[in-house]
Amino acid sequence: MVPDTACVLLLTLAALGASGQGQSPLGSDLGPQMLRELQETNAALQDVRELLRQQVREITFLKNTVMECDACGMQQSVRTGLPSVRPLLHCAPGFCFPGVACIQTESGARCGPCPAGFTGNGSHCTDVNECNAHPCFPRVRCINTSPGFRCEACPPGYSGPTHQGVGLAFAKANKQVCTDINECETGQHNCVPNSVCINTRGSFQCGPCQPGFVGDQASGCQRRAQRFCPDGSPSECHEHADCVLERDGSRSCVCAVGWAGNGILCGRDTDLDGFPDEKLRCPERQCRKDNCVTVPNSGQEDVDRDGIGDACDPDADGDGVPNEKDNCPLVRNPDQRNTDEDKWGDACDNCRSQKNDDQKDTDQDGRGDACDDDIDGDRIRNQADNCPRVPNSDQKDSDGDGIGDACDNCPQKSNPDQADVDHDFVGDACDSDQDQDGDGHQDSRDNCPTVPNSAQEDSDHDGQGDACDDDDDNDGVPDSRDNCRLVPNPGQEDADRDGVGDVCQDDFDADKVVDKIDVCPENAEVTLTDFRAFQTVVLDPEGDAQIDPNWVVLNQGREIVQTMNSDPGLAVGYTAFNGVDFEGTFHVNTVTDDDYAGFIFGYQDSSSFYVVMWKQMEQTYWQANPFRAVAEPGIQLKAVKSSTGPGEQLRNALWHTGDTESQVRLLWKDPRNVGWKDKKSYRWFLQHRPQVGYIRVRFYEGPELVADSNVVLDTTMRGGRLGVFCFSQENIIWANLRYRCNDTIPEDYETHQLRQA
């Protein structure tokens, strides 16, 4: 290296000398230019020297690495073929990764483990990305460092210390902890005063006004004006509930239409079936969340207990077979076995070996009438039973017509054919149609022939109805001063001196159902709303263009469903009423068709009843014979007094919006001419006081009143039975049905009379 450097130096000097002005001896002073050149040359030599040193270090490192990877010991020389010994490695600077200890062993130098936060063999270590272990709180950014990691601050709505660490094990075992801040407790919310603040994870929500306040988050919550019960006492009911005064003087809270709950708490009830859309913080059954929010199902039936009500569950029994294809939609039967090939699978068929699509079971013994040798369960075989469908173990038959008195519609007059053209349970052979008080009971069978009393109450069973009996309980105390008018108590004991005798305290009719829940507290024969037993009436029995209605009763008789696109028909309960309040929820659970549905009251026979019916769209009936009938959309109240009874005349008269002579009178029509909406729930309220002819019907869509007939006066029918009506419309639901005996004349009756005068 030295000779080469000297040559470079001499050549440089020679070149400089030749280029100068004049010749200068070699030992003379060099000019400034030569000095600069020498300095630059020297700097270049220094750079070369440093590069050489770096190369030496790299070559040494490579050599050590190769030697470290090979097995130590004797190696055969490539050149001589003789065994040779490879020299042992020794610890030296740079042999191991910075911070890693070098250990000298008998077999040579070894490096310790990589530092925390790194991975490798000690000689070479690379950084570990601890962020891959997700040590930070969700939504918090993780920053990888060399070595280690750190988490950014907890997100808004949470609090917690800073978090950082080194190593994968630490990152996995130690997660960042961020605790939710309860803004409702710390005051870090912006809800208006006197409203409900609801804490959520990482945030909060502002709810409705607190009890006792009204308004919202936009307008603020102001203290609600004091509300009072009918007796003048302060009301503790929910703002969407009414305070009701009971017979015994106690107060109850009842949620308003469109709301459900226990009255102290009420929540939205979209489908108007009596159950709130969301669970309320109260223990009563009516505080539970509705398992079908948009389809009324007042019984909340849920066969497979999956939390989805049968009314809105596409596979109600959970057997994997959709309802529309399942031959037992409410009984699990994935095999769909059906021995008798009727509509019902063996799992739910009450006559497995005999077709019986109606599944009728009169005595409710689990065996269908079609295969039951004792249909009524009175221990007399059907063939020998003179009332095979009505229990009558005595088999009494007064008129000897082969029909037992228990089921004979003319028990005192022979009529083996039992013809009853007007469906009033009085056979044609003895039906006089003479009814001077118009209550639906012919004079010969009426226990008060001149006083309307469709219910025919007779508390003392003396043959004289309570309506015309001065001593209903026959205890010797006239009704006018009897403190228990319906229960014998000649001593008139009244310990608390409240005017109600001890024997009828809290249960006026002594039917063992307390007055508070008794729908007819002055009629021991009627206690709860129940349509499980009902009469079917087909209003167009001729022809086969359409089928008869198919009625399904649910919720212990408080819900009815009609499934078929059918001829006009009725499902009528057997209980007759004088004054009555009747309410229910109406819902068409399909987008198919646009025809009539409604309810009836004052039913006396198939030619005499009131009907409230609702059509969706305007339509002319497809059969123009016997006359052209045009239905308009909207709610209609009609009085039916047909001279022909069920048949084509009555059918078309019912379809037609208007009067039809000798058939139907239109008493009121909703002037809005608005039809019902598909899959929308409506709540109706009917008041009927036949003693004065008072009728009023109201309809609600949610909490909003959408139709009101106001006072309508008509005395065509002075009492009768209740039921539901359909005409060519399928999938109708009448849910949360309630009736209540009520003879009290509403205040607006007097107001109406004054206006008329």
From Swiss-Prot:
Disulfides per UniProt: 91-102, 96-111, 114-125, 131-142, 136-151, 154-178, 184-197, 191-206, 209-221, 229-243, 237-253, 255-266, 282-287, 292-312, 328-348, 351-371, 387-407, 410-430, 448-468, 484-504, 520-741
Subcellular location per the Swiss-Prot or TrEMBL entry: Secreted, Extracellular space, Extracellular matrix
CDD domains with a match to the protein in the record: EGF_CA (cd00054), TSP-5cc (cd16077)
PTM section of the record: Proteolytically cleaved by metalloproteases ADAMTS4 and ADAMTS1 with ADAMTS4 showing more potent activity.
Leader sequence residues: 1-20
Outcome (variant: residue 361 to Y): In EDM1; binds less calcium
Spans annotated as COMP N-terminal: 22-86
Compositional bias annotation for Acidic residues: 467-476
Site feature location: Cleavage: 77-78
Quaternary structure and interacting proteins, as annotated: Pentamer; disulfide-linked. Exists in a more compact conformation in the presence of calcium and shows a more extended conformation in the absence of calcium. Interacts with ITGB3, ITGA5 and FN1. Binding to FN1 requires the presence of divalent cations (Ca(2+), Mg(2+) or Mn(2+)). The greatest amount of binding is seen in the presence of Mn(2+). Interacts with MATN1, MATN3, MATN4 and ACAN. Binds heparin, heparan sulfate and chondroitin sulfate. EDTA dimishes significantly its binding to ACAN and abolishes its binding to MATN3, MATN4 and chondroitin sulfate.
Reported function: Plays a role in the structural integrity of cartilage via its interaction with other extracellular matrix proteins such as the collagens and fibronectin. Can mediate the interaction of chondrocytes with the cartilage extracellular matrix through interaction with cell surface integrin receptors. Could play a role in the pathogenesis of osteoarthritis. Potent suppressor of apoptosis in both primary chondrocytes and transformed cells. Suppresses apoptosis by blocking the activation of caspase-3 and by inducing the IAP family of survival proteins (BIRC3, BIRC2, BIRC5 and XIAP).
Disease: Multiple epiphyseal dysplasia 1: A generalized skeletal dysplasia associated with significant morbidity. Joint pain, joint deformity, waddling gait, and short stature are the main clinical signs and symptoms. Radiological examination of the skeleton shows delayed, irregular mineralization of the epiphyseal ossification centers and of the centers of the carpal and tarsal bones. Multiple epiphyseal dysplasia is broadly categorized into the more severe Fairbank and the milder Ribbing types.
Family: Belongs to the thrombospondin family.
Name recorded for this polypeptide: Cartilage oligomeric matrix protein
